[in-house]
Amino acid sequence: MSTEIGNNTQFQATTPQEKVALEVSNFVTKNGGSLQFASAWLGNMEHESGLNPARIQSDLTFNSAWAFNPSTNGYALGLAMMDGERRVNLLNFAKEQKKDWQAVPVQLEYMWNHDGSDSALLKRMSKSSDVNQLAVDILVHWERAGTKNDPNEQIKRDRKSVV
């Protein structure tokens, strides 16, 4: 897997993570998003799943009873570690499409076009070129991370935004 970057130089993805990163980047730009957005979104995904689309929180095995129960939390899965109702909706989307939920294109299509108001939010954010602000916005508004209001995490983000 490769892509054209800049002035005719090519990037050859060799590791599984590089292949996922390139797939996400190509998806974002093909859908009108900026490379800065792709970078920020990838940073979030890397932190969440290590860019492993088959990852399940705490490296648990797949358990259908937990996975399809929207009340089950702490059983996030996929690139963005979707949990609760979002996890169930992703799984049902994949099932309706007769595709594997672990496939990167399935997860990207779901997040970009089928995740309700969160899809609209991604598309709006994807037009920005401020990678630092995007990293925070993705964390706070799209991911709705449990750490977003943690004072220590806020201090870290504030320090990074000053640098």
Predicted segments, located by residue:
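Surface-exposed acidic, glycine-flexible loop patches that form ligand/cofactor-binding
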Residues: 30-36, 123-129
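Short, low-complexity, polybasic intrinsically disordered segments
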Residues: 157-159
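Solvent-exposed, polar/charged alpha-helical surfaces in well-ordered, non-transmembrane soluble domains
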Residues: 22, 26, 30, 39-42, ...
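Conserved small/polar residues in nucleotide/adenosyl-binding loops
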Residues: 162-163
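Peptidoglycan-targeting cell-wall enzymes and recognition modules
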Residues: 6-23, 46-128
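Loop/turn elements at helix/coil->beta-strand transitions in domains of secreted/extracellular proteins
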Residues: 33-39, 118, 132-133
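Non-Sec secretion/translocation targeting segments of pathogen effectors
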Residues: 1-5
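Acidic helix/loop microenvironments that form the catalytic cleft of cell-wall polysaccharide enzymes
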Residues: 45-49, 125-150
